[in-house]
């Protein structure tokens, strides 16, 4: 039997939502093993006073949990 955990992560990029998502998943892979699915929950853009746009994306990421170690 498999058990999966789901977490929310947010990525940002000055380029695109796709880049924000890719960087968020790559960063999550640095600390979480066996990511299976990343689902887009929300997308938005932040615009600063100079008109610079930052693309932001919220992802729901699921990964397979390792079996518990015997105590």
Curated annotation (Swiss-Prot):
Keyword Calcium appears in the UniProt entry: yes
InterPro entries in UniProt: Dodecin, Dodecin-like, Dodecin-like_sf
Binding site residues for Ca(2+): 18
GO molecular function: metal ion binding
GO cellular component, as recorded: peptidoglycan-based cell wall; plasma membrane
Record keywords: Calcium, Metal-binding
Oligomeric and partner information: Homododecamer; 12 subunits assemble to form a hollow sphere with a diameter of about 75 Angstroms. Calcium ions are bound at the interface between three subunits.
Family classification: Belongs to the dodecin family.
Function of the protein: Binds calcium ions. May play a role in sequestering additional small ligands.
Official protein name in the record: Calcium dodecin
């Amino acid at each position: 039997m498999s058990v999966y955990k789901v977490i929310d992560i947010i990525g940002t990029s000055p380029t695109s939502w796709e880049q924000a998502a890719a960087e968020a998943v790559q960063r999550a892979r640095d600390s979480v093993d066996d990511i299976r699915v990343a689902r887009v929950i929300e997308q938005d853009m932040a615009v600063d006073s100079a008109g610079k746009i930052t693309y932001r994306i919220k992802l729901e990421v699921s990964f397979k949990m390792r079996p518990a170690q015997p105590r």
